[in-house]
A protein has these predicted regions:
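Basic, Lys/Arg-enriched alpha-helical interface segments
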Residues: 1-74, 80-125
Length: 125
């Protein structure tokens, strides 16, 4: 039985891929990339032959990028939180070299949110 890591898509990255990837071949490659990212064995061995998953250098929060297709340049940005994978963005082929600019343009997706403070009996009178 294959063990998988769940993928969370709070930002609609899967929907964006379906809408914006220009060919059926890239849509299939996107699904194959998600399959590899879910594969616990790839995480255990830290080998991602299809997506070449790697950490983005130069941003304060840990952000990772994975290839949808190396030739076309389409990339998936993701982060780990509590051992879970959270999809953050789908990067268009022509823009994949501008990685930090792409992250900064949507920085609210990448910044860790501080836990909400409890309202238990601490109200001002």
């Amino acid at each position: 039985m294959k063990i998988s890591n769940p993928i969370f898509d709070e930002w609609g990255v899967i929907r964006d891929a379906h809408k914006n990837l220009p060919s059926d071949d890239l849509k299939v490659a996107f699904l194959a990339a998600l399959e590899e990212l879910e594969d616990n064995e790839c995480h255990r061995t830290r080998k991602f032959p299809r997506t070449r998953l790697h950490k983005v250098v130069g941003y304060k929060e840990p952000v990772y990028r994975a290839d949808v297709d190396k030739i076309s340049g389409w990339r998936i940005h993701l982060q780990y939180d509590g051992g879970q994978i959270h999809l953050k963005d789908l990067i268009e082929g022509q823009k994949h070299d501008e990685v930090l600019e792409q992250i900064k343009a949507k920085k609210e997706r990448y910044e860790k949110q501080a836990p909400a403070k409890s309202k238990s009996g601490n109200s001002a009178r």
